[in-house]
Amino acid sequence: MTHRIYNFTAGPCTLPLAVLESAQAELLDFQGCGMSVLEISHRSKRFEAVHEETLALAQELIAAPADFQPLLLPGGAHQQFDMIPLNLLADGGSAAYINSGIWAEKALKEAQRVGDAREIWTGRDSGFTTLPDALPPLPADCRYLYLTSNETISGVQYRDYPTAAVPLVIDASSDYYTRAIPWERCAIVYGGVQKNLAPAGLALVFVRRDLIKDYPRVPKFLTYAAHAAANSLFNTPPTWQIYMLNKVLHWIKDSGGIAHFESESIAKSGLLYDYIDHSNYYQNDVPPAYRSRTNVTFRTPSPELDTRFWQEAEPQGFAGLKGHKLLGGIRASIYNAMPIAGVEALIDYMQTVAAKNA
């Protein structure tokens, strides 16, 4: 096996080694058909079986009820920023958005191009390091409350999802399949798969079936009804991403399911935060109640030392530690496939850097 390093990139994510090795073994000849999975038709019986199993596994592992339709859609999370208001506000009404960070803000701005989307709370004044402790009033005729479960850039995450008088729409991209979902409160739950589940190029979307309707004034490709009717095969799908998603879902199931990975997420992030909090060299700006378990942001005493930290990390076996360009600093993304040994190794490196620059 070639040398592997610890990949802390925010996305595309690190993938389980067992999944990569399995895909490598099948790459040239998928199930004895003499072709790669990259080459086979999305209408073939072999791929149809993969596709159907992926949808079923996705629904089973996250315990989505039967009244939710799983969809595998192109365009990642960005396309959902538009599809959600185009469908849920097609016949009027308003929507409430909690602006918890850059990703929630992007969704809000797109929704405002489509319909009456209101920002009911913003964390901008705190530098997006907090979340609302109480739910603000909702606008009249509100159809849904939109929130981003976890903000990868600033590193904030909801510990508990709010209860509202309207259903929730949750962007769960960066903590998908690391925690349970309160389905009884939801209208749509979605996420780009590139954080925890597969290579980039796909969104896994769950839509409550009673909300799947054909709206004549919405382009057909942007309706959930068209994709549901075609069983997520309305256009030629990204077969490789679906194949890899299938393998990662099997790996999640074989590893103990979401309950196992939630426990792991708490343990891994807890180790790193505990070291940062007791260090005189590193600092995290997010209050403990709002800290992300999947994207840990921190900084050293100066921007120059931040840069040196992540530049010198790669030769030591670590990738992807540079903070987002809008925030700077350092960021360690700890998704499901990151072993606890990777976090322990990172802490060892952090201790070495701190001692050297003390």
State the predicted function of each range.
Residues M1-I5, P315, G328-A358:
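PLP-dependent enzyme catalytic core of the Aspartate aminotransferase-like
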Residues R4-L55:
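A glycine-/small-polar-enriched, mobile loop at the entrance of the PLP active site in fold-type I
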Residues G11, A111, G123-Y177:
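Active-site phosphate-binding strand-loop segment of PLP-dependent enzymes
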Residues G34-M83, N87, I102, E110:
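Conserved N-terminal alpha-helix of the aminotransferase class I/II PLP-enzyme fold
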Residues H78-R143:
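PLP-dependent aminotransferase-like
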Residues V169, W183-Q194:
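Conserved active-site segment immediately N-terminal to the catalytic lysine
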Residues V193-Y273, P287, K356-A358:
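Active-site C-terminal subdomain of aminotransferase-like
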Residues Y282-A313:
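Conserved PLP-binding catalytic core of the aspartate aminotransferase-like
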